[in-house]
Amino acid sequence: VYSKDQLQTFSEEHPVLLTEAPLNPRKNRERAAEVFFETFNVPALFISMQAVLSLYATGRTTGVVLDSGDGVTHAVPIYEGFAMPHSIMRIDIAGRDVSRFLRLYLRKEGYDFHSSSEFEIVKAIKERACYLSINPQKDETLETEKAQYYLPDGSTIEIGPSRFRAPELLFRPDLIGE
């Protein structure tokens, strides 16, 4: 990583900030520190939980961070800059599940992409067209505006209620299997 081909710098000259996931075992943290100090000879290392740094970025030190990645979602309560590990909640529903749910909805609407990159296309649609509804029950009764999405092959598809139905999975895991 620190070679002339990559960062073009020397690890001995630069302190490192390493982020870690909530509930990361102490053993993993110790092993990472060992590698950075003994292999890369870094002068300093600061390890912090991603959620704490996210909260700091908002200018706050107390709050609850909802951190949803590709495979897991954490709710992390933080008080005066310190995560409260016994109160951290984890659920194995996250972005990948929303993408799968959106793919299911799109298939029900007649869209099947017949491509080896189908999942990447659906993920891109999710990232560009989906949104969280403030009141999904109300939006279900309304004639929601359809969004046009341009596919990589130049064709377009129209996405309606699937735009807010798929992300609702994050708040209603019971939707899995419906």
Regions found by a protein language model. Name each.
Residues 1-178:
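C-terminal region/appendage detector
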